[in-house]
Amino acid sequence: MVLADTNVIIDYWKMPDDRMTEIFNNEDIAVCGIVEAELIHGARSEKEIESIKEAISCFEMLSYSCNWEKLGRMLNKLRSSGISLPFTDAMIAQIAVDFNVELLTRDNHFKLIQSVFPELKLYPIE
């Protein structure tokens, strides 16, 4: 199973390249609530929200109860290492680590997280 980040889902929907098509066709793709929320946040209408919900229904939803202390410690360690990033990216990384799945993303923030937390596994896109 591979946890897909918001950016790769949007890229796949808007401009799928051969590599993304291969990944989405051959891997068990999962999303989490944060990714769902980010996708819905970007919608321009109720109709688009419904389309998003229908499109992501084919992915496995990773249900997650956040360990807030663990997340806080992750963010603290990242900040102490000079790394500042969006809160949502840290949460997505924590979910990937806790579920022991690779994260499919094109966002370089996750490489920074991985430099401090090598247990975060990134799916090779290129």
Annotate each language-model stretch with its function:
Residues 1-31, 40-53:
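Short, well-structured N-terminal submotif of metal-dependent ribonuclease cores
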Residues 5-7, 31-32, 84-86, 107, ...:
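Histidine- and aromatic-rich ligand-binding microenvironments
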Residues 15, 61, 115:
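Short, conserved catalytic or interaction motifs in soluble domains
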Residues 19, 91, 109:
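Amphipathic alpha-helical recognition patches that constitute DNA-binding helices
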Residues 36, 49-52, 68-72:
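A general structural signal for well-ordered alpha-helical segments in protein cores
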Residues 38-39, 70, 112-113:
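Phosphate- and divalent-cation-binding pockets in alpha/beta enzyme and binding domains
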Residues 61-106:
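Active-site neighborhoods of divalent-metal-dependent phosphate/nucleic-acid chemistry enzymes
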Residues 100-126:
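Acidic, PIN/NYN-like endoribonuclease modules and their adjacent C-terminal/linker elements
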